[in-house]
Amino acid sequence: MSSAGLLSGVEVGSTTVTATKDGITSNTVNVTVCSSLAGTCIDIFDAGGGKLFTSSPSVAYLDRIGGSATSGTITENGDYGPAGDFYIFDWNNANALCTTYNTLSLGGRTNWRLAERDELKMELYDVYLNMFTARGWPTDDYYWSATPVGSFYYYVVLRNGYVNSYTPSDTVYASCVSNP
């Protein structure tokens, strides 16, 4: 642990952490260190100002936390995301995923929602470029947005910034966002 109180993982595995300072003891928290996001972890990324984005969940992660409605799986081969299996979602199930995160108070927050097109494109891709390179996210498939266009919804490709739209029944990745 750093002098600023930052904990850094040095080995893959799980543990619990409790901190004490000036006679005050914190709550105990569970900490899991993963070798990649294909494991039982998810990336909760602060893109600035406390605004958090999640990577799309792996099968291992979502199953570990109790699951949510999904629409299938995709296997990343390591070219555009960490090698492993990830869930994909139709638009309704993508929204349900964010509701699941609220129920679980993911990252201590209960205001998770599906990211808007401009949040994915302008706040993630335009700033950090390829999210697999930047953060280890799966990017072989598109990411749903909450932004409608007629009876469709926009998606953003987080490996190249491409934006287009799909019908709500199509199945792709999902990133949930939480404002501070």
Language model feature labels by segment:
Residues 1-37:
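Extracytoplasmic soluble-region selector
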Residues 2, 46-47, 158:
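Acidic surface patches and DE-rich sequence motifs
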Residues 4-5, 23, 50, 151-152, ...:
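Beta-strand-connecting loop/turn residues
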Residues 5-9, 52-55, 156-157:
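Generic recognition of long tandem-repeat/solenoid scaffolds
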Residues 15-23, 63-70, 124-136:
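Surface-exposed flexible segments
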Residues 26, 52-54, 163-164:
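Short, isolated positions in well-ordered beta-strands
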Residues 34-112, 154:
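Extracellular adhesion/carbohydrate-recognition regions
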Residues 95-113, 117-170, 175-179:
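An exposed tryptophan-centered "aromatic clamp" motif
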